Amino acid sequence: MQQRRPVRRALLSVSDKAGIIEFAQALSARGVELLSTGGTARLLAEKGLPVTEVSDYTGFPEMMDGRVKTLHPKVHGGILGRRGQDDAIMEQHHIAPIDMVVVNLYPFAETVAREGCSLADAVENIDIGGPTMVRSAAKNHKDVAIVVKSSDYDAIIKEMDANEGSLTLDTRFDLAIKAFEHTAAYDSMIANYFGSMVPAYHGESKEAAGRFPRTLNLNFIKKQDMRYGENSHQQAAFYIEENVKEASVATAQQIQGKALSYNNIADTDAALECVKEFNEPACVIVKHANPCGVAVSTSILDAYDRAYKTDPTSAFGGIIAFNRELDAETAQAIISRQFVEVLIAPSASEEALKITSAKQNVRVLTCGQWASRVPGLDFKRVNGGLLVQDRDLGMVSEAELRVVSKRQPTEQELRDALFCWKVAKFVKSNAIVYAKENMTIGIGAGQMSRVYSAKIASIKAADEGLEVKGSAMASDAFFPFRDGIDAAAAVGVSCVIQPGGSIRDDEVIAAADEHGIAMIFTDMRHFRH
């Protein structure tokens, strides 16, 4: 749909002034009359642009420390006036049509994120006039263009040049969608913030409610439609958060390969989050959201080789994540050895990409290096509701471990215990992980009985010819009975790391002592469902 509308008059009022000077210059050069407010007007005037202050246009001054600037009939009449229908009344009241509104809002999110931000500070950064203009212009998109993102400035000028100073209805409608998304996200942030302040605001407590407001408003941006969801009869799409600061599958750049599937994204997230736990060069291989092989070494090539040995059968068609740049030697080893769905690493060398390009279906993603983990929320949908919790960023240090057995672990056992404890955090419960010399030996995942997870881990190790004797065993939660320790002893496990906390801890510790096993308590559980 063309339905072009010329842009003859624009109102500019922005908090984020990135690119606004150049955009205003481009509009002015194309004969567009500029209206503006406050700091934006002063900035444009300083740059020599012909700009009319809104207060001069309306004949009504800004007041109440800038709280009232644009809330005036001459402004909103000019925005909401329907061309060809409201012309007479606009002329009667000396209301000039405004064809474009360029607005972004007070930085509420940045304000409340600052340490020590008071409720009064937050309140003063709630924009009133801005959202009102945005919604007015978006409502009247048939006649008015609303611009809320500086990333649209260049495209708008190009379209105006291609259409003799006009914008099409398709463009105005797309801009209106962005505008309503913008105000919805803005109001959601304010509602979430105020909802989390309720007890403190009413004097019921000195503390605010915390991370969980009484109404939770979420805004995600669609990154891509999927061919289908977890199964082919389910429709699906991938949505991401705005301004994600941590390297993630959501922010990763796909270098090559087919479009990512729903299951690819879920599994890649599991692999990447696991590999982030390690400081040394590490490799994590994931299948169906569970690690099937993990190792750390002096190079990612050796880490991959050792991770693959844990379970070559399950590694087929898996997801492989690294915490170092993917190099040519490692890429060649993977491509020549196995079928892989996705490779993800902070970066990939040009030589590595030349090698992976020979397998065009292999998806290669780079996510950038990460410095730290960013606290956030995890969500789990249930029928009729949503479970919300903090991300599980907990991880014990060596100094926080408690040895509860008679025998102390050796230095190697301690290293292996810490290693497999990190892996167990990412294995579906009930989770058991055997590890030795910084590589997984066997992984038992997702069993209803913890002792059966232990048995499966030992079976997997035996199937691959890996020696369990002398390995460490991690359990994501406490052992309710001694049978898990007896099963571990039967295959030669020499050290067990677990949270502790069972009413039968004494029996479990006694079993470890009976078998000469060193037992370590973390006092931290890592259920994963």
UniProtKB/Swiss-Prot annotation:
- Gene Ontology MF term list: IMP cyclohydrolase activity; phosphoribosylaminoimidazolecarboxamide formyltransferase activity
Record flagged with keyword Hydrolase: yes
- UniProt catalytic activity: (6R)-10-formyltetrahydrofolate + 5-amino-1-(5-phospho-beta-D-ribosyl)imidazole-4-carboxamide = 5-formamido-1-(5-phospho-D-ribosyl)imidazole-4-carboxamide + (6S)-5,6,7,8-tetrahydrofolate; IMP + H2O = 5-formamido-1-(5-phospho-D-ribosyl)imidazole-4-carboxamide
Please provide, in alphabetical order, the Gene Ontology terms of the cellular component aspect for this entry. cytosol
Which positions make up the signal peptide? Answer: none
- Superkingdom, natural source: Bacteria
What's the name of the protein? Bifunctional purine biosynthesis protein PurH
